[in-house]
Amino acid sequence: MSTHLLEQLIDAFRILPGVGQKTAQRMAYHVLEREREGGQRLADVLSRAIEKIGHCTECRDFSETKICAICANYSRDRHQLCVVESPPDRLAIEQATGYRGLYFILQGRLSPLDGIGPHELGLDHLGQRLAAGEVTELIIATNATVEGETTAHYLALLARQHGIRPSRLAQGLPLGGELEYLDRGTLSHAFGTRTEVV
């Protein structure tokens, strides 16, 4: 019996974060032995998602439409713009706080050693949004890592260039911590006690 296809399936599972060889093997065998129908459903949904989910032209979040539901919602405060590194960070803030402004998702953080500069993060597009004059506060919600702090500093400079007050999430964020893994209470407190970036 050829195991070439089985090996490809195991390798395919390994693209997921935190999934090593052993876990990928368990997943592959589980799908083939006990969950073929679920595996087919997963394959179908994954295929459709890859085909149909793109990025919102306003905030760069994942969306099935040109403009996502948050950006299209005119009851949200268009004077506040919260910048986060990733869609899971946006989701964490949305679920844990009463924030009713808009977002901008960087899809990463500045990391010159990895070839990630302002262009890769869409900061030219962010600059255009800030220049439009609607935003009065830029809330910087990058992670408390070296790259996150570097990105926050760059964002604060960009905001000031456009006469916009930058603020940063405050207490409760552990150094080196990732927003998506914080509990709701900590994130809500940090969001509520954000400080102006100097």
Curated annotation (Swiss-Prot):
InterPro entries: DNA_Rcmb_RecR, Rcmb_RecR, Rcmb_RecR_Znf, TOPRIM_dom, TOPRIM_RecR
Molecular-function GO terms, alphabetical: DNA binding; zinc ion binding
GO biological process, one term: DNA repair
Domain Toprim: start-end pairs: 79-174
Pfam families xrefs: RecR_C, RecR_HhH, RecR_ZnF, Toprim_4
Family of this protein: Belongs to the RecR family.
Protein name as catalogued: Recombination protein RecR
